[in-house]
Design a protein with these regions (language model features):
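Enriched for short, Lys/Arg-rich terminal
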Residues: 2-5, 16-24, 54, 62-85
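Flexible interhelical turns and helix-capping residues at alpha-helix boundaries
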Residues: 15, 19, 34-37
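A short, surface-exposed loop/turn module that caps and links secondary-structure elements
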Residues: 28-53
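Nucleotide phosphate-binding site architecture
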Residues: 12, 45, 82
């Protein structure tokens, strides 16, 4: 099954501000998520969110299996990303 990936505008703007190499690594990982959203992912403790590691960056997302949706919650450097979660 292929999931639909939802990336909010604020996340797209963050991606645009990141470097080309970082942006391409993140996008390729997001495309991979569409087919297998839990592969190489870890659940964030005490939340419904998942995370994947891409070098020093993290992608936080939620999965809605009944609708086949993946909603990207946040993308950022590992030292800053967990302050909200």
């Amino acid at each position: 099954m292929i999931y639909t990936l939802i990336i909010p505008n604020k996340i797209n703007k963050k991606l645009d501000r990141s470097g080309i190499k970082t942006k391409s690594r993140i996008i390729s990982k997001l495309i991979f998520l569409k087919t297998n959203p839990r592969h190489h992912a870890e659940r964030i403790k005490d939340t419904e969110f998942w995370k994947i590691r891409i070098g020093k960056f993290r992608v936080i997302y939620s999965i809605e299996d009944n609708k086949l949706l993946i909603l990207i919650i946040n993308i950022g450097h590992r030292k800053n990303i967990y302050k909200k979660y």
